[in-house]
Amino acid sequence: MSILKIGIDEAGRGPLFGRVYSAAVVLPPEGTIDLSMIKDSKKFTSKKKLKKVEEYIKENAIYWGIAFEDEKTIDKINIRSATFKSMHTAAKDVIKQLPDDVDYSLMIDGNAFKPMMVFKDGQIKQVEYECIVGGDDLHKNIAAASILAKVARDNYIEDMCEKHPELIERYDLAKNKGYG
């Protein structure tokens, strides 16, 4: 039996402002949908194209989930722990959608992850995972997760700028997205 690979990535770990977002994605097997447009979110030059691909992923992914941790959590537990927490939440959103008999593992973009426990088959088990540096360039599931996380965070920043125009005037937040 094959193992379902859940791609996970984050957006917002580096900025000085705002939430950290994570996404988890399972795409259909290659050849069943067009995966050619799915790439690392940082490689998109057009915001419009990025949003179009995000919509395509949401319509065509088998499973997907998005989660965030806010500034208060980041300040309380630190950005690294908040990132892992949002990754766990996004992964659990996907895992809850899976049939009980499906085996799965996580593919994490990056070099670190906090092991995650789930209740399965009447036991508490650690979820298998692999950290992959540059994973968003190597695996479509991770690239798709990077897109969902980035668009969700960008939408949050845009919403904040609409509600608080002074964030644009004082910090140019609409352009720099909190990266300083």
Predicted regions and their residues:
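RNase H-like, Mg2+-dependent phosphodiesterase core
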Residues: 1-180
